[in-house]
Design a protein with these regions (language model features):
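Alpha-helical transmembrane spans
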Residues: 2, 116-165
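Phosphoinositide-dependent membrane-docking surfaces
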Residues: 3, 9-29
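Residue-level detector of beta-strand face positions
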Residues: 3-4, 38
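Short, solvent-exposed coil/turn linker segments
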Residues: 13-18, 52-54, 114
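Generic preference for hydrophobic/aromatic residues in regular secondary structure cores
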Residues: 20-24, 35-37, 95, 99, ...
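A membrane-cytosol interface segment of integral membrane proteins
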Residues: 31-96
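Eukaryotic phosphoinositide-binding membrane-targeting regions
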Residues: 96-125, 129
Length: 165
């Protein structure tokens, strides 16, 4: 699918999702080291670090999990990621609707969830699995370098006339 990112002043940059490489950027602040996802268009070297998906996170695994969710979301052969934000739309996607029917997924799972109980039980387990997941061993289908090169190293490799990061 296509990605459309705002450049400001009513201008947009649009390109196929597969043309974007994702990088984890370390953000050093007074309160500690944080992480965010940066998108770089492979052919123009334009970088985007102020998107809805570039929030600063305290955990690198949270950023890597977000990239995994985005790849799943953009892959039309897979069901939509099972996240609260997408639940109201799952029935509109044929692949997801079929998957949910086969798996017996409650169409209101997230909306009817007792959040506090979930945080103490299953949610706590999900977070633990995400934190312990061997992200560095996983081969990213779209961006094989994710997590293998730092943003500082990437900046050094960029052409001098590339879009500034």
């Amino acid at each position: 699918g296509l990605v459309r990112l705002a450049l400001g002043r009513g201008r947009f940059f649009e390109a196929p999702f597969v043309e974007f490489d994702a990088y984890v950027d370390r953000v050093i602040q007074q309160s500690g080291v944080f992480y965010r996802l940066i998108f770089v268009h492979r052919y123009t070297q334009k970088s985007f670090h102020k998107t809805a998906f570039s929030t600063i996170e305290s955990s690198k695994s949270e950023v890597l999990a977000l990239w995994d969710v985005l790849q799943t979301y953009m892959d039309v052969t897979q069901p939509l990621p099972d996240v609260p934000r997408l639940e109201p739309f799952r029935h509109l996607d044929p692949v997801t609707a079929e998957h949910d029917l086969r798996s017996g997924r409650n169409p209101r799972f997230w909306r009817d969830l007792d959040l506090e109980a979930w945080k103490q039980g299953e949610g706590k387990e999900w977070l633990k699995r995400q934190m312990e997941y061997p992200w560095d061993k996983r081969q990213c289908r779209l961006t094989p370098q994710l997590g293998k090169i730092s943003m500082a190293e990437y900046r050094k490799l960029r052409p001098a006339d590339a879009w500034p990061i």
